[in-house]
Amino acid sequence: MNKNEKMVRSLMGTVVSNKMNDTVVVRVERRVKHPKYGKFIKRSTKIHAHDKGNECQIGDIVTIRECRPISKTKSWTLVKINERAEKVE
């Protein structure tokens, strides 16, 4: 890695909303250990990500990476769609 390159955070999650123009809401799940009981618990956070071209559908599994702030709530951008959601007819 050169001096000019920065480590960029990237996460994988599921698209839960695509109703906004050029924006998707991605739910990212993580597992944390309960401090007292030691059981692993699922915790999730919802992140707004920039989706140029409105490619994502609800249920898609996507990779997002951190970028400069695009708006008040958006500072992540879509890298790729790992898995498409199945169409239900």
Swiss-Prot record:
CDD domains recorded: Ribosomal_uS17 (cd00364)
Keywords: Ribonucleoprotein, Ribosomal protein, RNA-binding, rRNA-binding
Organism ancestry: Bacteria, Pseudomonadati, Pseudomonadota, Gammaproteobacteria, Legionellales
Role description: One of the primary rRNA binding proteins, it binds specifically to the 5'-end of 16S ribosomal RNA.
Matching HAMAP family: Ribosomal_uS17_B (MF_01345_B)
GO CC annotation: cytosolic small ribosomal subunit
Species assigned in the record: Coxiella burnetii (strain RSA 331 / Henzerling II)
Span of the signal peptide: none
Recorded family membership: Belongs to the universal ribosomal protein uS17 family.
Gene: rpsQ
Superkingdom of the source species: Bacteria
Gene Ontology terms describing biological process: translation
UniProt entry tagged with the keyword Oxidoreductase: no
Subunit structure of this chain's protein: Part of the 30S ribosomal subunit.
Pfam families on file: Ribosomal_S17 (PF00366)
Protein name: Small ribosomal subunit protein uS17
GO molecular function: rRNA binding; structural constituent of ribosome
Keyword check for S-adenosyl-L-methionine: no
